[in-house]
Amino acid sequence: MKIEKPIFVVFEGIDGSGKSTLCKSLTEKLTERGIPSVNFTEPTNFETGKYLRKFLRGEIDLERKEQIDAFLNDREESLRQNILPSLESGKNVLLDRYMYSTAAYQSGDDLLPETIIEKNLKKNFKIPDLLFYLDLNPAIALERLSQRKENKERFETLAQLEKIRSAYNRILPKETIRIDGVKGPDEIVQECLEIFLRNFNRKFL
């Protein structure tokens, strides 16, 4: 089933909040209902994103301005090659992380999260139609992360996650849909599915 106007949905949250699982699961739920949907993540799998992942893994160091520039460059590729073509083809786009992550994660005493958001908006990056934020206590998120087998990324410490959560609370738009990240993944995806369908008046429930 092709919907009249495809929707751009973004998922935000600190590491360990469950947003990546939610993004994939909701895409599957929509697809099962015959609603054309695709999901992507930032950083991307393009060269711009691979460069950023090296930084996130601690393999290279970047000054804060270099970090911001790298994320902006990757976001341009994300929009040009993934997001906009998919929307134009009639598919909903569900995105794991967007400009709000950059503002929350790359901000510091010398660069406010609000300033980073402004830099993104000046680029005329597309604003999401729906923005979900999975809110979770950093201590719980860190416990979840410790159970994973992957190597830690540079932001996966309690102090960093607390700073990031605080920054999110400063910059997320008032229309952001906040989801309790403590809930189970099945309950969360059902809640978000109902919100998606209700917001756009699609009678697939």
UniProtKB/Swiss-Prot annotation:
Q: Which residues bind ATP?
A: 13-20
Per the UniProt entry, the Enzyme Commission number(s) are 2.7.4.9
Q: Which reaction does it catalyse?
A: dTMP + ATP = dTDP + ADP
A GO molecular function annotation here is: dTMP kinase activity
User: What PROSITE patterns does this protein map onto?
Assistant: THYMIDYLATE_KINASE
Broad enzyme group = transferase
Q: Which biological processes are named by the entry's GO terms? A: dTDP biosynthetic process; dTTP biosynthetic process; dUDP biosynthetic process
* UniProt cross-references to Pfam families, sorted A to Z: Thymidylate_kin
Q: What is one cellular component GO term in this UniProt entry?
A: cytosol
Q: Does the keyword Nucleotide-binding apply?
A: yes
Instruction: Keyword check for 4Fe-4S, yes or no.
Output: no
**Which key words are in the record?**
ATP-binding, Kinase, Nucleotide biosynthesis, Nucleotide-binding, Transferase
Homology family: Belongs to the thymidylate kinase family.
Biological role: Phosphorylation of dTMP to form dTDP in both de novo and salvage pathways of dTTP synthesis.
Q: What is this protein called?
A: Thymidylate kinase
Protein's organism? Leptospira borgpetersenii serovar Hardjo-bovis (strain L550)
Taxonomic lineage is: Bacteria, Pseudomonadati, Spirochaetota, Spirochaetia, Leptospirales
